[in-house]
């Protein structure tokens, strides 16, 4: 078949390998590269191991509930409560609740012990929490679970509505179980979920602090969150740097299983959280991100989720030292920017068996995040690149299928981020790039299957290209065009890998 070629290294259409420097006269120059034969077998690796997911079930989550002792609830002032400090501090946040409650603000507090929502409602005046229809409850105050307390919103609850007008929200400083139910931010004025209308408008939210456990199972969370700190939607967060030394809490954790998250500012956010499991969920039409693990979170399992319709940015993003995690078997599609992103020094992660398609930017994007394995993913029909890698070293792209992306299948480059809005002290980086690309298929990508600028090391082996876009078929251009004969000899006749390095002076 004329349009099918399989070789040890096959670069169809256009493969650019360039590095730019500046001479004393200020002229840009492109140093030469050496292209040499290398054995291919040492590049082969075993299929990576993935975590056993069989233990993360509704039954296992329910088994974690301690029903005794019984808890108690009371209404008290919000002031001088550590778990509320974030929400009554600077930038007139206290004023938000004063205006909504028309008094010095108070909240519902669950003290040590177990309560379900029905028990909680029975213990409180209806002005704070009431049943408006069988199984439907409206909360008009914040609800705070204190250390040692457990709140269970269970299947006897058809829906818990957190009043937008009343300024209700959920703070977990103990244990929270949301199972087989629905929890919505609620507009009493519109008698509907508090659908997103404009940036900065208060909407109820959930935050679980350091030392807590959160379990959301077979449930729907709708219209949570806005722009204020730790009020993003569904958040699992260690206490802030100013509070953490005082609180001395271990990192928070939780499971989110087989649930739906719709119209939230962030579908999920975490900060310095460990061992969170996000499994089998749907993140639909969220505003900024679908799934957004952040700052120094570790050992996360993000598996079998659908993240789609995100309106401002990405479906799934791991940002700022989110390490040692598994992003596996997800689908990220129809998002405003990229499907899956690793960002700001997120390293030692496995991104495998995912599908990213019809995103308005890249299928997958790696920014300043080295030493990650991208294994056997599919990126199809994205508006820019299948996989983009920037300022990242030790990135391994193995057995990926990259098809019909508007620009390139794989795009690697460096970029000087000085002058951007990046805080270079908080997020340092090196403008270096090294890639190993082994196996997989690149099919009908728009401008080229692979384009790489300024690598410090590039290894390619055993790639398959189908249906090259250009009428003249296979052609090497740029620096590789100068050595195309030697390159094809290495790849076609010797069936070896190609090692591409900058020429040393």
PLM regions: where:
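Bacterial N-terminal signal peptides that target proteins for export
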Residues: 1-9
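Bacterial N-terminal signal peptides
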Residues: 8-18
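C-terminal/domain-terminus segments
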Residues: 455-471
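Pro/Ala/Gly-rich low-complexity, hydrophilic intrinsically disordered segments
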Residues: 212, 476-479
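Exposed, low-structure sequence patches enriched in small/polar residues
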Residues: 391, 452-455
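Beta-strand/loop edge motif enriched in small/polar residues
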Residues: 24-323, 332, 340-341, 347, ...
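Conserved, well-structured beta-alpha core segment at the onset of a catalytic domain
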Residues: 3, 24-27, 449, 459
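Eukaryotic tandem repeat interaction scaffolds
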Residues: 323-433
């Amino acid at each position: 078949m004329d349009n099918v070629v399989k070789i040890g290294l096959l670069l169809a259409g256009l493969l650019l390998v360039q590095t730019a420097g500046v001479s004393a006269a200020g002229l840009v120059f492109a140093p030469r590269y050496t292209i040499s034969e290398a054995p291919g077998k040492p590049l082969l690796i075993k299929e990576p191991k993935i975590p056993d997911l069989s233990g993360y079930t509704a039954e296992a989550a329910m088994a974690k509930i301690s029903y005794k002792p019984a808890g108690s609830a009371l209404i008290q002032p919000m002031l001088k409560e550590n778990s509320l400090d974030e929400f009554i501090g600077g930038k007139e946040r206290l004023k938000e609740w004063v205006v909504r409650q028309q008094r010095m603000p108070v909240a519902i507090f669950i003290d040590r012990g177990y309560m379900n929502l029905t028990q909680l409602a029975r213990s409180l005046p209806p002005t704070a929490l009431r049943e408006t229809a069988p199984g439907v409850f409206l909360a008009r105050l914040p609800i705070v679970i204190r250390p040692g307390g457990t709140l269970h919103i269970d299947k006897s609850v058809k829906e818990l509505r957190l009043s937008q007008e009343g300024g209700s929200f959920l703070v977990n400083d103990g244990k929270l179980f949301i199972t087989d139910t629905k929890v919505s931010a609620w507009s009493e004025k519109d008698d509907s979920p508090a659908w997103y209308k404009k940036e900065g408008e208060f909407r109820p939210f959930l935050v679980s602090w350091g030392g807590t456990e959160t379990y959301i199972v077979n449930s729907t969370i709708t219209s949570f969150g806005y722009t204020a700190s730790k009020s993003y939607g569904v958040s699992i967060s260690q206490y802030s740097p100013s509070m953490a030394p005082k609180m001395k809490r271990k990192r928070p954790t939780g499971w989110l299983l087989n649930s739906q998250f719709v119209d939230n500012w962030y579908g999920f956010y975490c900060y310095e959280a460990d061992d969170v499991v996000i499994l089998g969920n749907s993140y639909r039409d969220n505003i900024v991100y679908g799934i957004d693990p952040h700052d120094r979170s570790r050992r996360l399992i993000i598996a079998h989720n659908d993240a789609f319709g995100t309106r401002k940015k990405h479906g799934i993003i791991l940002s700022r030292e989110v390490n040692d995690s598994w992003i596996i078997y997800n689908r990220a599609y129809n998002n405003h920017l990229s499907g899956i992103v690793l960002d700001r020094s997120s390293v030692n992660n496995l991104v495998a068996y995912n599908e990213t398609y019809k995103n308005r930017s890249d299928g997958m994007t790696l920014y300043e995040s080295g030493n990650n394995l991208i294994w056997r993913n599919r990126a199809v029909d994205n508006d820019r690149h299948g996989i983009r890698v920037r300022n990242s070293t030790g990135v391994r792209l193995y057995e990926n299928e990259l098809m019909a992306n508007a620009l390139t299948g794989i795009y690697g480059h460096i970029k000087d981020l000085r002058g951007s809005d990046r805080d270079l002290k908080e997020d340092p980086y090196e403008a270096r790039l090294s890639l190993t690309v082994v196996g997989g298929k690149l099919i009908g990508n728009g401008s080229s299957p692979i384009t790489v600028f300024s690598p410090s090391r590039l290894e390619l082996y055993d790639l398959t290209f189908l249906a090259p876009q250009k009428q003249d078929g296979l052609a090497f251009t740029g620096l590789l065009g100068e050595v195309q004969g030697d390159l094809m000899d290495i790849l076609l006749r010797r069936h070896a890998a190609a090692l591409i390095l900058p020429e040393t002076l």
